[in-house]
C-alpha cells in the first residue's frame, strides 16, 4: 500500500519546501523505497506555461510534455523517478476537471461545491500522481502543498489532504510542516512565536504535524526546540533544524542526521535498511574541492531572477563537477549588448551561453552575442532561442541574407529563417496544429522527441546516432532556408525523425573550436550524478579555451 507524506509551509513563502521534500525523498530512496513527489499549486492558472519567469521562475518540462513548476526539476535532480504531468497540478486544473464533469452531467444534478466535489477531485489527482492502482504505484508519495498555511487559496488543498489522511487510516500518512524562525538582531535571539501561530493555524484546520522543519540562518538551539515542541504539540525529536547552507546537496545529510527519515519510517511503519548517503557526501566533497574555475556568461532577458534559468544554472554546476571545476555564472542582460560593445562586455569569459526565451526584447543583443562568440572563437552554447539567434546571426553576416530574422520578432522580415511551424506530430503520433491566432497555453512543441544526428559532427561526438531531448517552443528553423545556410557553411547536424525539423546547428570544428545551438532544452535532463553530455562538453570546451594557447 502506498504511504503518503504531506509537506506544508507556514509564516512566509520561499522557505524551500521543494528542496526539503526532494531531500526527504532522496533519503527514503537510499533506504530502498520507491518514491515519487507531487506538487500541488494553489494558483488558478491551469499550468505555469503562460506565466512570466519573473512571476514564477522557470517552467520545467517533463518527458510527456507537461509544463510544470520548477520544483519538479529539483525532484528529478534528487531522485531516480522521472516526473510526469500527474506529478503537478493546480487549482486551475482541478476546477477545469470539475467543470468538465459538471457539463457532462457526472454529478447527476447535484449542486457542485468546494466540499465535497473540489476536495474529492484533489484527492483523486493525488492518487493518480502516486500511481495507485497501476504498475507505477510507489511505496511513498511525498505531496508538497504550495502556498502558505493561512492563505485562502490553500484551504481546499489542506482540507483535501486532511480528508485523505483520515481515509488512509493510521500509520499510512504523515505531516511535515516547514516554518520560519526569524532572527531579531536588536534582541539577539530567534523568535518562535510565528512558528507557534502557524502550527496553531494548521491545527485549527484539523492537521497535527508529525515533524517541524525550522528554517533559520543557523542551527536552532536545543532550548528553542524544547519551547517549540511544548507550544506546538510536536514531539521534541520531531522539531528539526534547517539552516542556510552553501549548497542544496547538503540538505539530505542535514535532515538524516537529525532523524527525519527515521521518524517518518516509524510513523508509517516502514521496515527498511539504514539510509546510505555516501553518494551525497561524495557530491558535496566534489563541490567543495574544485581544481579550477571557469567563467560563463549567460546572456538573457530574465537575469534579475536566477530562478528563471534554474535548470540551466544547475546543469552548468553539474558539468563543472564532472570536469572538477567551479563554474562561476554571470548573468548578463542582453539589452545592454550591441555589436559595438560586445567585446568589452564578454571578453573576460571562458564561454558564452544564450538560454531560451520569448519575445523581441533583448533579441538584438543576443544576436550580437552570437556574432562575438563566432568571430572570436569563444565556446558558444545556444539553447532554444539561443540556437535561433545564432542561426539569424549566421544568415545575416555569413550567408548574406540581409534583414534575416524570426517572424516572432519581425513578421515582415524579407528572410524568415525562423518561422512558426503550423503542424507537427507529438512523440505518440498525435497530430498537433497551431497558428498566429492560437492560444498561448499548451500550443508549443512540448516534451521528449527524438532526432537523428549526422555522423562526423560535434553533435555526434556528444550524443551518438540519436538524441532524445525535451522541447518547449513555437518557432522553428525555416526548412526553406536550410540549403542556403548549408551552402554558406552552417552545419545542420540533427533533424527530427518525422518532420525533419532542425534540432542542432553548429560550426565546423575547422572554423570554430566549439559552437553549437540546440532547439531543445537539455538542461531538464541534467543530474548531479553524471551531468549532461552537452553541458559536460561545453564546460570542457570552456576549460580548453581558458588555456593560454587557446587565448592566443
Curated annotation (Swiss-Prot):
Catalytic activities: UTP + L-glutamine + ATP + H2O = CTP + L-glutamate + ADP + phosphate + 2 H(+); L-glutamine + H2O = L-glutamate + NH4(+); UTP + NH4(+) + ATP = CTP + ADP + phosphate + 2 H(+)
Domain of life: Bacteria
Assembly behavior: Homotetramer.
Positions contributing to ATP binding: 14-19, 71
Protein name: CTP synthase
Residues the record lists as binding CTP: 13, 151-153, 191-196, 227
Listed GO MF terms: ATP binding; CTP synthase activity; glutaminase activity; identical protein binding; metal ion binding
Binding site for UTP: 13, 191-196, 227
Record InterPro entries: Class_I_gatase-like, CTP_synthase, CTP_synthase_N, GATASE, GATase1_CTP_Synthase, P-loop_NTPase
Family: Belongs to the CTP synthase family.
Activity modulation notes: Allosterically activated by GTP, when glutamine is the substrate; GTP has no effect on the reaction when ammonia is the substrate. The allosteric effector GTP functions by stabilizing the protein conformation that binds the tetrahedral intermediate(s) formed during glutamine hydrolysis. Inhibited by the product CTP, via allosteric rather than competitive inhibition.
Amino acid at each position: 500500500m502506498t504511504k503518503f507524506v504531506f509537506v506544508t509551509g507556514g509564516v512566509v513563502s520561499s522557505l524551500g519546501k521543494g528542496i526539503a521534500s526532494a531531500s526527504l525523498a532522496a533519503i527514503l530512496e537510499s533506504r530502498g523505497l520507491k518514491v515519487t513527489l507531487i506538487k500541488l499549486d494553489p494558483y488558478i492558472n491551469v499550468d505555469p506555461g503562460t506565466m512570466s519567469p519573473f512571476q514564477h521562475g522557470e517552467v520545467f518540462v517533463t518527458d510527456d510534455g507537461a509544463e510544470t513548476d520548477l520544483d519538479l526539476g529539483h525532484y528529478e535532480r534528487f531522485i531516480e523517478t522521472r516526473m510526469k504531468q500527474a506529478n503537478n497540478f493546480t487549482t486551475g486544473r482541478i476546477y477545469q476537471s470539475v467543470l468538465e464533469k459538471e457539463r457532462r452531467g457526472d454529478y447527476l444534478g447535484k449542486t457542485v461545491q468546494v466540499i465535497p466535489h473540489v476536495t474529492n477531485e484533489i484527492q483523486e489527482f493525488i492518487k493518480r500522481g502516486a500511481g495507485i492502482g497501476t504498475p507505477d504505484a510507489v511505496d511513498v508519495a511525498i505531496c508538497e502543498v504550495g502556498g502558505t498555511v493561512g492563505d485562502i487559496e490553500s484551504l481546499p488543498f489542506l482540507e483535501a489532504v486532511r480528508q485523505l489522511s483520515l481515509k488512509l487510516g493510521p500509520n499510512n500518512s504523515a505531516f511535515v510542516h516547514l516554518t520560519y524562525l526569524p532572527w531579531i538582531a536588536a534582541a539577539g535571539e530567534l523568535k518562535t512565536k510565528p512558528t507557534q501561530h502557524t502550527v496553531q493555524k494548521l491545527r485549527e484546520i484539523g492537521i497535527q504535524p508529525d515533524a517541524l522543519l525550522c528554517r533559520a540562518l543557523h542551527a536552532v538551539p536545543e532550548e528553542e526546540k524544547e519551547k517549540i515542541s511544548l507550544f506546538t504539540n510536536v514531539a521534541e525529536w520531531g522539531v528539526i533544524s534547517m539552516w542556510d547552507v552553501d549548497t542544496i546537496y547538503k540538505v539530505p545529510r542535514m535532515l538524516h542526521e537529525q532523524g527525519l527519515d527515521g521518524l517518518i519510517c516509524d510513523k508509517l511503519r516502514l521496515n527498511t535498511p539504514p539510509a546510505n548517503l555516501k553518494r551525497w557526501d561524495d557530491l558535496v566533497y566534489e563541490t567543495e574541492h574544485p581544481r579550477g574555475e571557469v567563467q560563463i556568461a549567460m546572456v538573457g532577458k530574465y537575469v534579475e531572477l536566477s530562478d528563471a534559468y534554474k535548470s540551466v544554472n544547475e546543469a552548468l554546476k553539474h558539468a563543472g563537477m564532472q570536469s572538477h571545476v567551479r563554474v562561476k555564472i554571470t548573468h548578463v542582460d542582453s539589452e545592454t549588448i550591441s555589436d559595438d560593445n560586445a567585446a568589452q562586455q564578454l571578453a573576460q569569459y571562458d564561454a558564452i551561453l544564450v538560454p531560451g526565451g520569448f519575445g523581441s526584447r533583448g533579441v538584438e543583443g543576443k544576436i550580437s552575442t552570437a556574432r562575438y562568440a563566432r568571430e572570436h572563437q569563444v565556446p558558444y552554447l545556444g539553447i532554444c532561442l539561443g540556437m535561433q539567434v545564432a542561426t539569424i546571426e549566421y544568415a545575416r553576416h555569413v550567408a548574406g541574407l540581409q534583414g534575416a530574422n524570426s517572424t516572432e520578432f519581425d513578421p515582415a522580415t524579407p528572410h524568415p529563417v525562423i518561422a512558426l511551424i503550423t503542424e507537427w506530430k507529438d512523440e505518440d503520433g498525435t497530430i498537433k496544429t497551431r497558428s498566429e491566432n492560437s492560444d498561448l497555453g499548451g500550443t508549443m512543441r512540448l516534451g521528449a522527441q527524438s532526432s537523428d544526428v549526422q555522423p562526423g559532427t560535434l553533435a555526434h561526438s556528444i550524443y551518438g546516432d540519436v538524441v532524445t531531448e525535451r522541447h518547449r517552443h513555437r518557432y522553428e528553423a525555416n526548412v526553406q532556408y536550410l540549403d542556403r545556410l548549408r551552402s554558406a557553411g552552417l552545419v545542420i547536424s540533427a533533424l527530427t525523425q518525422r518532420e525533419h525539423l532542425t534540432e542542432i546547428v553548429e560550426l565546423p570544428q575547422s572554423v570554430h573550436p566549439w559552437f553549437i545551438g540546440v532547439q531543445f532544452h537539455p538542461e531538464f535532463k541534467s543530474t548531479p550524478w553524471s551531468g549532461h553530455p552537452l553541458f559536460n562538453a561545453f564546460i570542457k570546451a570552456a576549460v580548453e579555451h581558458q588555456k593560454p594557447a587557446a587565448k592566443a
